[in-house]
C-alpha cells in the first residue's frame, strides 16, 4: 500500500494514501490504534488552548473520540461531550437540536 509521510506532534508517521475521487487521493490521517500519536496530539491541542477559559471539551462523533478522551484525561476534565447525528438507546436524556 502506498503511504504519505507526515510529521505530526513531533512524531513521524506514514499514512495510507486513499482514493477520494478518480483524480483525488489523500494521505488518511488515522489515529485509531496509535496511542502514542493520540497522546501527543492531545498535548499539542491543549497547548493551543492554554490561557483560554473554556467550560467544556466538545467534539463530533467517531474518529475524534479517542482524542477528546485523552485531552480530558490530560487536562483533568471530569467530562467531555460528543455531538452525534442522533440519540442512542443508552442515552437517558440527550440534549437535542433540530436542523434542516
Model-predicted regions and their roles:
Residues 63-66, 87-89:
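Short, catalytically relevant binding-site loops at active-site mouths
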Residues 54-61:
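Short glycine-rich phosphate-binding loop at a beta-alpha junction
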Residues 78-100:
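Short, glycine/charge-rich flexible loops or terminal/linker lids adjacent to PRPP-binding catalytic cores
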Residues 8-9, 60, 82:
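Glycine-enriched loop-and-adjacent helix/strand subsegments that border the catalytic/binding cleft
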Residues 66-76:
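Short Gly/Thr/Asp-enriched flexible loops that form oxyanion-binding sites at enzyme active sites
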Amino acid at each position: 500500500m502506498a503511504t504519505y509521510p507526515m510529521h505530526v506532534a513531533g512524531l513521524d508517521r506514514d499514512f495510507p494514501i486513499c482514493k477520494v475521487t478518480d483524480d483525488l487521493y489523500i494521505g488518511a490521517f488515522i489515529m485509531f490504534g496509535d496511542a502514542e500519536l493520540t497522546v501527543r496530539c492531545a498535548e499539542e491541542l491543549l497547548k493551543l488552548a492554554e490561557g483560554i477559559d473554556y467550560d467544556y471539551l466538545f467534539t463530533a462523533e467517531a474518529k475524534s473520540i479517542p482524542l477528546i478522551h485523552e485531552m480530558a484525561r490530560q487536562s483533568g476534565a471530569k467530562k467531555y461531550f460528543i455531538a452525534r447525528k442522533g440519540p442512542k438507546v443508552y442515552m437517558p436524556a440527550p440534549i437535542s437540536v433540530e436542523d434542516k
